[in-house]
Amino acid sequence: MKKYWHIALMLFCVFMITSCGDDDEALEVDEVWKVQNEEAFQAQMLVPGFEQLSSQSNAGFILYKVLKTGESKEPIYYTSKVECYYKGTFIDGTVFDDKSFEAGAPAELTVSEMVDGFATALQNMHPGDRWEIWIPQQMGYGSAGRSASGSVIIKPY
C-alpha cells in the first residue's frame, strides 16, 4: 500500500509541474500602433542633428543625437557594467521607464543584458556622454513587448 501512495504522489507532482508551466498568453498585436511608431521613426530620420548608427547584430540602426560630449574617451564594451540615467518614452510622450537624473539614482546595467538598440548606443558612447536615441521596434522590445526577464514592458507590435 505504501508503494502505491508514492506512485500517486509522484503522479500528482508531475501534474503540478506540468500545470505550473509557462502560460504564454497571446499578446494582441496592435497594427495601428506599429505603423504609427514606424512613421515616427521615419520622420525622426529627417530631423537635423540625428545620425544613424548600425547595430553589430545587423538588426537595423538607431537614431542618435549628441546632446553632450563627456570628458572621458574610455570605451564601453558589450560586457561592460555601466551606471547611467535614462528615460524610456513612447512616441506619445508616455514614460514607460524612468531612471533619469530627476528620478534619483542611476541605473546599474550590464550592456549585454539590454535590448539591442540600447546596447548599440551604449557601446558607441563614452562616460559622460549624453545622447537622445530613437530605437526602432526590431531593436527594442519588438513584437514580444517583453524584457529579458519575460515581463511585459511595452505594448507589443
Regions found by a protein language model. Give the residues of each.
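C-terminal motif of bacterial Sec signal peptides marking the signal peptidase cleavage site
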Residues: 15-19
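Sec-dependent signal peptide hydrophobic core
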Residues: 5-13
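Cross-family detector of peptidyl-prolyl cis-trans isomerase
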Residues: 4-5, 20-157
